[in-house]
Amino acid sequence: MIKKLSLFLSFLMALSLSSAVFATSAERDEGIKCISKGSWQTALYDKDRNGRDVYTNIRVGDSYKGGQCMGRCGGACGGWAPSAWTKDCLDHDICIVDQNGENGLAWDKNCGDEFNHAADDYTFGVWRGCRG
């Protein structure tokens, strides 16, 4: 059990490190950066993997063009499990709404790199205290 958990954590760490290597000059994996619900943040994503950078000012937790709970890691707004509120998840959320994300996952042609940046936030954000 511990060996499997260790292998899984190693995989996630490698995934987060590899996504930082392929980021554009302005857009980077910010690690796990907690953000507070209700605060104003500037979301950043690049169009079409390494394309033009897009910046959007938004209040964390607000709805945006039909998307809800901007900045909350994971799908939807509710649920029984605690969730993290982070900058990388905000970047991914805004990208998915603006670019009509195909599936929101790592292989999404527009927002896959943002998904990779947010993967460690989703997995470890609550442990790091990013509860909004």
Task: List the model feature ranges, each with a label.
Residues M1-L9:
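Bacterial N-terminal signal peptides that target proteins for export
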Residues F22-G132:
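Extended terminal accessory/targeting regions
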